[in-house]
Amino acid sequence: MANSIKQVTVKGSKFNLGSIESAAIAGVEQGENIFTGGNNHGVKLLVAGAANTVTAADSGKIIVFNVAAATLCTLPAPKIGMKFTFITSILATGDHEIQAATNGHGFLGGVTVDSTTAAKADAFSANANGADDFITQTGGTNGGGAGSIVTVVGISDTSAAGCWLVSGNLLAVGSTTVTPFATS
């Protein structure tokens, strides 16, 4: 071991190091650890196409639309407290869609849609009856710009309209903005 550090001082306070901490310092000193980025266990990257599904095990994760092409992501059956945060990291050139698992599931709540190219913004709500089961961002007037974010939270354990609560801010392109919510 190049350095036998046994104690460190942080903001004037001294701390004794145990064997594990000393070994970690030695490993870093010897260049044995390569740090390439943060922990990505809380992130799920979507691929182009309609084969993307999030599961109950993905609850709490950040779900990333990271390809411009059309991408569909289907939600699981709802459970109270289940939460998914969808982020768009690239301007959509095809539809970026979030779909409820069945037509019987649906969204409540709403999002804002802000144009990045014109002084235009508006707020849109899902149908109050919970019938909307799609959120579609095209990269145009209804969101899909890089930086768009949608959070979906399960508010019912039953397969019923209005079992998902939605909030978010979508970035659009153009002089008009339109709703991203639809029934199909």
Predicted features by range, described:
Residues A121-S148:
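Structured beta-strand segments within beta-sheet-rich domains
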